[in-house]
């Protein structure tokens, strides 16, 4: 199985980010997965504490983690989100240019232990199907009507 790299963008939500990364680390296939974290620079002082906590946490995780490789991009200025050359856009552009597939997530997701396996199998299964443009690991609790 091909293990797609994972991209995570973050800024200052330390507790959310830590849960996200640690749940990803517990996934089947994590040891074969490259992870790219893009830590944006705080736009103002009110974001500095959470940003510093994430930065310190990542310094420790870079040295000791359960991934094939943990790559951290520390932005030197605030890139923002949802605008040209924003933190999200820059990381996605890098992954798109260097890999034929990738997994992108927010920093507040907590993953099931089979998440990576599920997504990677889906990416392989539908690789050549032009009708499929993405594999999703979330299902909104929609009130399905079960019939006979």
Regions found by a protein language model. Name each.
Residues 114-148:
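Conserved donor NDP-sugar-binding/catalytic core segment of glycosyltransferases
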Residues 20, 91, 118-122:
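Alpha-helical scaffold elements adjacent to nucleotide-binding pockets in ATP/GTP-utilizing enzyme cores
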């Amino acid at each position: 199985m091909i293990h797609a790299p994972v991209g995570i963008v973050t800024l200052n939500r330390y507790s959310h980010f830590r849960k996200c990364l640690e749940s990803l680390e517990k996934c089947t296939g994590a040891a074969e997965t490259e992870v790219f974290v893009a830590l944006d620079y705080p736009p103002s002082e009110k974001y500095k504490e959470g940003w510093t906590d994430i930065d310190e946490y990542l310094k420790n995780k870079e040295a000791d983690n359960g991934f094939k490789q943990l790559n951290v991009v520390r932005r030197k200025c605030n890139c923002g989100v949802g605008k040209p050359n924003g933190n999200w856009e820059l990381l996605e552009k890098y992954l798109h240019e260097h890999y034929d597939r990738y997994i992108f997530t927010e920093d507040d997701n907590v993953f099931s232990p089979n998440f990576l396996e599920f997504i990677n199998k889906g990416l392989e299964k539908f690789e050549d199907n032009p009708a499929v443009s993405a594999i999703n690991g979330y299902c909104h609790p929609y009130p399905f009507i079960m019939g006979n």
